[in-house]
Amino acid sequence: MAGTMGRLSVGVTGLQTSQYALNATAHNLINTQTEGYTRQQVLLTDQSYNRVATDSYYINNVGMGVVTAQIRQVRDQFADDTYRTESGRMSYYKAQYETVSEIENYFGELEGKDFNTTLNDMWTSMQELQKESNSIVTRSSFISNALTLIDRVQTIRSSLIEYQRNLNTEIKDQVKTVNDLASTIYELNQQIRAVEAGNVEKANDLKDKRNQALDKLSSIVNSEVVNNEDGTVEVYLEGHTLVTLGRTYTLTTQKVCENEKYQQNYGFTGSSTDFLMPVWEQDGDPLFNINRVPTADSNSDIGSLNGLMMSRGYFISNYTDVPTKPTKPLEKDFANNADYQTAMAQYEQDVKDYVKDLEYFNTYVEPYTITNLEAQFDVLIHAMVTQINDTLCPNKTVT
């Protein structure tokens, strides 16, 4: 009788574990359309054995059936890390794409007439003026096109600056989102740790919520996740701690011109603006390294917040921020050797200044979409105005 009951007991354990497995399958099917849900899998293991006989040659054990070892999530950490990296990279370039698309509107169909047409009209009227400088019609056409060009230039430049300032709002919103996600991850850490403390139950649904928060965080800023044995995670942003088991660290925004660490650590000397940048509230350290040009190899082209910063830049630029390569003097252009040597000495100094200015341009201007465009656009307009002035009012030596 005991043997029969023992076998029935073993069968009961099989039925029970099968029921658990069916419940897990049903749970998976119900949540197939649930965002962030991770498929769960039941792992089975042997129950304890009952020793019924033993001698010097063998031990005779009788199995007591099967039990559920755990219900685990079917996730691949490598796949998670890869997805978060590429999701962040997509968000980075999406932010820059949206900036470029907005800028194209300023130069394209702004006020129903693209900027290229305005330039062509101005150039045509200049040519006509050179042919018929005494014609009132030609002069009027030139003045009209010149006023139109000036108005368009002022409108485009003011639109670029206004767009830069408007990005402050997006930057503040994303910093707030990062802080909210950090708090969510921290709270879920505490709940998961409490549920799994007895090593009896797995907090799978809570982990799904945490993974959703981690996925969203990785799309905003480059993050690294470290899994702990107790089920909690630690999170790092750009090498700085964001979430630990004991606390969260907070980001805030600060005006670029008011952050001393940018001036000290990065040698940044950009003009004073009301542009905001993300910094760590605890020590004022900037979140991003302004001296680092983002690249895929270094995984520094990740996150929509970084994309916004690289789109906007840190200051308003103009043509003086674009270095002009000095022209080497020719000896034949000088009356004597002394004047030539003086010119060469000045040229050598100008080359040194040019190298320094070029380094500044490559670091603080060229990598930033709007800042670079402002500078290059100003160079174009400055050169055009100079040429117009030279054409209409040439410098002449009076003898």
Predicted regions mapped to residue ranges:
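Structural signature of extracellular appendage/secretion-system components
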Residues: 1-399
